[in-house]
Amino acid sequence: ATREELSDRLAHYGSHFWLMFDGGTLIAFVDGMVTDRADLTDDLYADAALHDAHGAWQMIFGVNTLPDYRRHGCAGQLIERAIADARAQGRRGLVLTCKDRLVHYYAKFGFVSEGVSVSTHGGVVWYQMRLTF
């Protein structure tokens, strides 16, 4: 996402960003809007105003970690927190898309692959993953 897109997302659903710091440095974050839509479609990435605070599904748009902090469990801790928060908020579950090579990673958290996503975001083949409570 661009700086402008992230700024727009923060303005619309800042409470759906999970952040990890090392001292004063942001080292990892997970973010995504809430919606009643069951599938993660490209228009959701493009328009932060589609966020519905009372929606059934927590979407995960980004799982980001600085290179020096990768493979230390940072992203996993944030994903677990996002899952716990979605459960506590009474959501039906979470939905994300990922590349084929990461399907097994998200499966460790209980996400199930639903196959190739309708999303063509960034010109990439994405797999939709869902964790249902």
Q: What are these regions, as identified by a protein language model?
A:
Residues 29-64, 70, 80, 119-126:
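Conserved acyl-donor/pantetheine-binding loop and adjacent beta-alpha core of acyl/acetyltransferases
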Residues 15, 124-129:
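Short hydrophobic/aromatic beta-strand or adjacent loop that forms the aromatic wall/cage
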Residues 79, 85-99:
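Conserved GNAT acetyl-CoA-binding A-motif
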Residues 1-23, 29-40, 44-50:
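Active-site rim helix/loop that mediates acceptor-substrate recognition in acyltransferases
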Residues 73:
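Conserved G/P- and acidic residue-centered "switch" motifs that form tight phosphate/ATP-binding loops
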Residues 88, 100-124:
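Conserved active-site alpha-helix within GNAT-family acetyltransferase domains
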